[in-house]
Structure formats: structure tokens, C-alpha cells
Amino acid sequence: MSTAVLNKHLADAHEVGHDHDHAHDSGGNTVFGFWLYLMTDCVLFASVFATYAVLVHHTAGGPSGKDIFELPYVLVETAILLVSSCTYGLAMLSAHKGAKGQAIAWLGVTFLLGAAFIGMEINEFHHLIAEGFGPSRSAFLSSFFTLVGMHGLHVSAGLLWMLVLMAQIWTRGLTAQNNTRMMCLSLFWHFLDIVWICVFTVVYLMGAL
């Protein structure tokens, strides 16, 4: 009788260990797959950057970057996005500690910062269009709106993903699946920060000089 019980416990332990290994492998595959997606996104952004570089001087008699860019405004945008990257890092640290409430709180702060960034970007676009400097004004402005707008759409998608993730953590806790999702969103969010630094340098900083 005792041998049968012992064998049952060993079998159960083996099954639990197998399930844990399977979950670990599944999470690793998900993160690897997301890295592949980010590489395709790199190609996409590189193509749009190249297009902008070709068209930057095609102003068709309209304004150049030096005429329309407001560096102090864009610096505030940049600072907000960079701080949001730090707050997301704090959310990850909280998740590693198993602090569900702290993780959700830091994700909420990150969401608010990201929303503020998008709000400022929309305000910038509205101001330019109201001044008659919309995307149809010149090839330069068309490429500018495409590049900056595409980054903004990615940030908006990240914000939507963040809302869904906060709801999942709130209802299910910091499960292995949710931790994997947090890792993937972390890669995405930091990737967008790096892209924005490139946008700020190539488009705004070089354009304003």
C-alpha cells in the first residue's frame, strides 16, 4: 500500500514538473517569436526613415523642418516617453517580486504617460494642419506625418495592449502567461522608445538645425 502511494506521489511530481517545463518552454517560444516580430518592425521603420531622408528637402516651396519644429515642445514629449520606459521597468520589478498591486499601479502610471505623449503628438499634428502644413502640402510633410504618425499608432497599440494586460493581471494575477505578456510588452515599449530617439534626432533635431 505504501509503495503504491509513493509511486502515485512520484508520478504526480513528475507531471507537475513536466507542466512547469512546458509552460517555461511555451513562454520562451512566445518571447522569441515576439523578437522576430520586432525585427520586421525594424525593417518597416527603417524603410520609412529612408523615405523621409530622400524627401526631406522636397518642400515644394513650403516650410522646412526649421520653420515648423518647436524643439522645447518635442523635448517634453521625449522626456515623457523616456520616463514611461522607467515606470514600465518598475512594473516589471514589481511583477518579479509578485507584487500584483504595485505592478498594476506602475502600469497605470506608464499608461498615463503614454497617453500624454499621444495627446501632445495629436496637438502638434492639429496645429500644423491648422496652419496649412498638412501632409498634402509637400513630399517632406507627407513623409514627416507618415513617420511620426506610424510611431504614434504603435504607441497607441501599446496603450491598448497595456489596458488589456492590466485587466488580465487584476483578474488572474501574475501568472506565467501574464508575466510572459508583460515581458513582450516591455520589449515593445522599449523598442518604441528607441525608435522615438531616432525620430527626435533625425527628424526634429537635425531638421531644426
UniProtKB/Swiss-Prot annotation:
For this protein, what is any one GO molecular function term?
cytochrome bo3 ubiquinol oxidase activity
Task: List, alphabetically, the InterPro entries matched.
Answer: Cyt_c/ubiquinol_Oxase_su3, Cyt_c_oxidase-like_su3, Cyt_c_oxidase_su3-like_sf, Cyt_c_oxidase_su3_a-hlx, Cyt_c_ubiqinol_oxidase_su3, Ubiquinol_oxase_su3_dom
**Lineage: superkingdom:** Bacteria
Q: Which residues lie on this side of the membrane: Periplasmic?
A: 51-72, 124-143, 208-209
Q: Is Oxidoreductase a UniProt keyword of this protein?
A: yes
Which stretches face the Cytoplasmic side? 1-29, 94-102, 165-186
- Listed Gene3D superfamilies: Cytochrome c oxidase, subunit III, four-helix bundle (1.20.120.80)
This entry carries the following GO cellular component terms, namely: cytochrome o ubiquinol oxidase complex; plasma membrane
Q: Where are the transmembrane segments?
A: 30-50, 73-93, 103-123, 144-164, 187-207
Q: Which CDD domains match?
A: Ubiquinol_oxidase_III
Record keywords, A-Z: Cell inner membrane, Cell membrane, Electron transport, Membrane, Oxidoreductase, Transmembrane, Transmembrane helix, Transport
- Tell me yes or no: is Transmembrane helix among this UniProt entry's keywords: yes
Q: Where in the cell is it found?
A: Cell inner membrane
Q: How does it sit in the membrane?
A: Multi-pass membrane protein
User: What biological process terms from GO does the record include?
Assistant: aerobic electron transport chain; electron transport coupled proton transport
Subunit and partners: Heterooctamer of two A chains, two B chains, two C chains and two D chains.
Query: What NCBIfam families does this protein's entry cite?
Result: CyoC
Belongs to which family? Answer: Belongs to the cytochrome c oxidase subunit 3 family.
Protein task: Cytochrome bo(3) ubiquinol terminal oxidase is the component of the aerobic respiratory chain of E.coli that predominates when cells are grown at high aeration. Has proton pump activity across the membrane in addition to electron transfer, pumping 2 protons/electron.
Report the protein name in the record.
Answer: Cytochrome bo(3) ubiquinol oxidase subunit 3
Organism of this sequence: Pseudomonas aeruginosa (strain ATCC 15692 / DSM 22644 / CIP 104116 / JCM 14847 / LMG 12228 / 1C / PRS 101 / PAO1)
Its lineage reads: Bacteria, Pseudomonadati, Pseudomonadota, Gammaproteobacteria, Pseudomonadales
